[in-house]
Amino acid sequence: MAAERLNSILSHLRPGNKGVAAITQKNPDDVVITLSLRTPLTKARKGGFKDTDLDYIVYALLKEVIAKSQIDPALVEDVCLGNVRSTIKPSAQLFKYDSISVNDGKAAYLVRAASLAAGIPHTAGASSVNRFCSSGLKAVQDIANQIQLGAIDIGVAVGAEMMSASGDRLNKPFNDEVLKNQEAADCMQPMGQTSENVGKDFNISRAQQDVYAAESFRRAEAAQKEGWFDDEIVPITTRVKDPKTGEEKSVTVSKDDGVRYGTTVDSLSKIRPAFPQFGDKSTGGNSSQVTDGAAAVLLMRRSKAIELGQPILAKFVGATVAGVPPRVMGIGPTAAIPKLLEKFNIEKNEVDIYEINEAFASMAVYCVQNLGLDHAKVNPRGGAIALGHPLGATGARQIATILSEARRTKAKVLVTSMCIGTGQGMAGLFVNEQS
């Protein structure tokens, strides 16, 4: 194994060994994805997961990973959860200790317990990461890094967010000394304010944003009607409570519920601004939906995948993060994507599909324009405006979606990216290996 890893490293260091030809090479030491799936995405506080807790959905998803991959769970060496706001109380569906509370920032407790309950033995590790909206991709990167370093052979990355049970508010202002720095103070700006800043600073009109949003809904509607989401989604059985009677019943959630069929530019233009105190361009129709959901990615060393007879869906090439001014955090992908492509000497037109998170139409329009991308290549199945944006899940959800689309279209070079609160962007590069 050490010799394989050394040869792989040396191959990357050879002069001229960059570009598409380099990233599409297959080496025993590559990090590969053998399974990528997600739950349906449902409306927060209204949809099928409104009464489902974070620990339960992670548990249910990990059980699906084991069942669908047919991997021996004893071979899993680490599980990493990307999550922004963990729920307050462990699920009564899974754990029977009503006196225990798990506070925000304690997602590591939840993922450890959920992984054990799902059948992954205590010999595996578990951890959580939080880089806001890139947390799912960050979890993938963390598992991939361990594989690349030889620390583990197999790991699972999960991204999950149950926004029905949590918000995203900064409860305590920063220290006065910290606030003397304007960019530090800007980190406290609400996301809606940063969206309006992007619209104002870069002249992204309300009409442009509504046109973009309508197209996101159109694409998502078409994809859902054609059944394109079916192979990336696993149905999840959970319980929902009737808000009037308090009665609980078991339901199986099998499809995204945020796609509004028949959405048009005209219908979007009639929606009132969502953040009138900051501006008049961002609305509930051209911004991402508040959503519950989760996604998981099974990663391993290529040689191990071949040994186990696991199907190789894609190669994880790399991921990177970049910073931008916090007050316009939405433009993060315009820094992260070029940085990523430059590292691997890839031209933007050599990428077949881009998944760029649609936190707000303002940032989505700006990113497509600023990067000079062919919009047809960006979010071909729609994005967060139509599907929803469960914060910690998005980075992993995008991988499930882009690999499904690549399987359908035979696309090869794939990029996922998202903006990140406080002024960052992250991007990941993948090579589709599905026939």
Language model features with spans:
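Conserved catalytic cysteine-centered active-site region
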Residues: 4, 9, 52, 80-154, ...
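N-terminal extracellular/periplasmic Venus flytrap/periplasmic-binding protein-like
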Residues: 7-23, 28-32, 37-40, 51-52, ...
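Catalytic phosphate/nucleotide-handling subdomain of diverse soluble enzymes
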Residues: 297-308, 403-407, 431-434
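Conserved active-site "lid/cap" helical segment
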Residues: 13-106, 110-118, 125, 197-206, ...
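Flexible glycine-/small-residue-enriched beta->alpha junction loops
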Residues: 144, 148-202
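Glycine- and Gly-Pro-enriched alpha-helical subdomains that act as flexible
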Residues: 171, 300-350, 368
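Beta-strand segments within the central parallel beta-sheet cores of soluble alpha/beta enzyme folds
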Residues: 74-82, 96-99, 126-130, 157-160, ...
